[in-house]
Amino acid sequence: IVPNHAYQACWNAIEFIAKRWGAKVIVIDIPFIIEEEDQIIELILTAITERTKLALIDTVTSPTGMRMPFERLVTEIQNRGIDVLLDAAHGPGIVPLNLEKLDVAYMTGNCHKWLCTPKGSAFLHIREDRKSLIKPLNISHGYSADLNAQEKFRFEFDWTGTQDPTPWLCIPKAIGSLGSKVTGGWPEILERNRKLAIYGRKLMCEALGSEPSTPESMVTSLAAAEISSKMKKKDENLQYDPLHTSLFDDYGIQIPVWHWPHHNTRYIRLSAALYNGEEEYQYLAQALTDSL
């Protein structure tokens, strides 16, 4: 099962594997506007059947910037004997992640987004009882190694060919360095950025005349707002939305503006990091007002 807020590349991978093995992908329609997280829980759990084998769940959705109730979903789904693949591309650095407590079957997340590590740095976690089932895309020397499950897992995934491991090696230092920028460490960073995203979303919604898409409890360092139908829409022949181009060219603002076909909704998504301040969202709101 795949919620329709899933990142398209991951969704495509699920579709590809399902087609190869004759499986069926069940897409769960979750609205763009959510009143409470229980809506999501109910929609996903209702879609599960006795034939369900795997659920792709996000920590925070990339297209729509919504914090999924992933902790509850992992517990509820896996208690039904179904494995969860937790997509934490937007996870490290914006939500607390406790691998032991989550006990999720599979989890992968990027570090270059919110931990400020080099591109190509990420992590893959596979629960101990699932390690022997998973192989890397490239089969190399580790495949024939006579090792225990953990050693074989590391050998197979660490050595898939000639590569530069520098981005991976930067992760521990980046976590420590960024966490030392404020006295409260990472808990303070997460809460500070969340409050800033909520503040920015409020200004953005006021400028656009739209309603918040989720309650504040479902906001992390990402937040999205629907764009009024009054604003000039993207020409299908153009690669970028005209509002995105205008904000970048005329105001020096880089912010995603998308039309999400699964909701037939056009929206804008902001992010809030330690280097951002309230004045930047005020500037964005004014730019949006001028663009109406």
Per-range role (PLM):
Residues I1-L292:
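Pyridoxal 5′-phosphate
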